[in-house]
Amino acid sequence: MDNTLLSLTHEQQQQAVQQIQQLVQQGISSGEAIAIVAQQLRDTHQKSEEK
């Protein structure tokens, strides 16, 4: 499992859910929406570790 996603705070989890719901409302499949948000979270986490 992805440690980046496992270490999210409750607030970050809620934000991710909201982003996924917005993408689904725009017509993106739930699986694709989850993949998009997960990648965004990984990218954000990676950038913060590079600092």
UniProtKB/Swiss-Prot annotation:
InterPro entries: UPF0181
Family (UniProt): Belongs to the UPF0181 family.
NCBIfam families: PRK05114.1
Protein name (record): UPF0181 protein HAPS_0710
Organism this protein belongs to: Glaesserella parasuis serovar 5 (strain SH0165)
